[in-house]
Curated annotation (Swiss-Prot):
InterPro entries membership: Thymidate_synth/dCMP_Mease (IPR045097), Thymidate_synth/dCMP_Mease_dom (IPR023451), Thymidate_synth/dCMP_Mease_sf (IPR036926), Thymidylate_synthase (IPR000398)
Top class in the EC scheme: transferase
Ligand binding ((6R)-5,10-methylene-5,6,7,8-tetrahydrofolate): 194, 287
NCBIfam families: PRK01827.1-2, PRK01827.1-3, thym_sym
Subunit organization: Homodimer.
Recorded name of the encoding gene: thyA
Keywords: Cytoplasm, Methyltransferase, Nucleotide biosynthesis, Transferase
Source species taxonomy: Bacteria, Bacillati, Mycoplasmatota, Mollicutes, Entomoplasmatales
Active site (catalytic residues): 170
Protein name per Swiss-Prot or TrEMBL: Thymidylate synthase
Function, as annotated: Catalyzes the reductive methylation of 2'-deoxyuridine-5'-monophosphate (dUMP) to 2'-deoxythymidine-5'-monophosphate (dTMP) while utilizing 5,10-methylenetetrahydrofolate (mTHF) as the methyl donor and reductant in the reaction, yielding dihydrofolate (DHF) as a by-product. This enzymatic reaction provides an intracellular de novo source of dTMP, an essential precursor for DNA biosynthesis.
Binding residue positions for dUMP: 21, 150-151, 191-194, 202, 232-234
A cellular component annotation (GO) from this entry: cytosol
Signal peptide from the UniProt entry: none
Length: 288
């Protein structure tokens, strides 16, 4: 995906070095935008291998309105583990358990998981219950009834509850646009984007969301417009980022939704990726 590599080069060229909340340090650029045409293929990064199963599970978890990571850890999705673990470490119950021991206890102890596996009122809660409003169901209904409305909006940023979230929403606000000839576009505003670890996930995640909404509403997915406020590369990811820049993007894969079920009932097994080829995996530490 050349757009992603263009974003990386823009940040390295024009960004500024900044201190950050995690004390890792970043190179940051404010206000960037990239456009991905889903008609050309599913925008799953090819310059490093991406664990797309985690992306699919997470999106279904959002749609269900879930905020406890039990479903994720049971499906070997590790992307949220560090935040509840760091929260647990601050408690009087912490007894020097490792992260892996913490995760295993979440899997096997429901009472412990109910207490320590919840992230607070994060994405799923806001999508499905923003002050009593099911934004997601309303969006689907409104697209079907009034497709050309300019009010097809879902917000995960709730100022009344943001301080109760273990991590305030990075991808915080999105809007859907329906063209007169049956195409569905989506623009995401992301307040903060970890370009090495997070942004490749976010691109594929919202592309999947587009495909799911389009199928539900009898439309076709077209443009994903990704707007990022603080787009940053952590300083401890520079070696990995430069390795990616040496790699040539490969052809994009395809995605299929093999079900006629409602978007609210779609399961992981209903989603299929065809022809995904990538360069080797590149790892990096998450900044918490």
């Amino acid at each position: 995906m050349k757009q992603y590599l263009e974003l990386v080069n823009e940040i390295l060229k024009d960004g500024e070095k900044r201190e950050d909340r995690t004390n890792t340090g970043t190179i940051s650029k404010f206000g960037v935008q990239k456009r991905y045409d889903l008609r050309e293929g599913f925008p799953l990064l090819t310059t490093k291998k991406v664990f797309y199963k985690a992306i699919f599970h997470e999106m279904l978890w959002f749609i269900k309105g879930d905020t406890n990571i039990k479903y994720l850890v049971e499906n070997n999705v590790k992307i949220w583990n560090e935040w509840p673990y760091e929260n647990f470490k601050k408690s009087s119950e912490f007894n020097n358990e490792t992260l892996q021991e913490f995760v295993e206890r979440l899997k096997n102890d429901n009472e412990f998981c109910n207490k320590w596996g919840d992230l607070g009122p994060v994405y799923g809660k806001q999508w499905r219950d923003f002050g009593g409003i099911d934004q997601f169901a309303k969006l689907i209904n409104d697209i079907k009834k009034n497709p050309f409305s300019r009010r097809h909006i879902v917000s995960a940023w709730n100022p009344a509850e943001v301080d109760n979230m273990l991590l305030p929403p990075c991808h915080s606000f999105w809007q859907v646009y329906v063209s007169k000839d049956g195409w569905l576009d989506l623009q995401l505003y992301q307040r903060s984007g970890d370009v090495f670890l997070g942004v490749p996930f976010n691109i594929a995640s919202y592309a999947l969301l587009m495909e799911l909404i389009a199928k539900e509403c009898n439309l076709k997915a077209r443009y994903f417009v990704h707007t990022i406020g603080d787009a940053h590369i952590y300083l401890n990811h520079l070696e990995q980022i430069n390795e990616q820049l040496k790699r040539k993007p490969l052809p994009l894969c395809k995605i299929k939704i093999n079900s006629e079920k409602s978007i609210f009932d779609i399961a992981f097994e209903d989603i299929e990726i065809e022809g995904y080829e990538s360069h080797a995996k590149i790892t990096g530490e998450v900044a918490v």
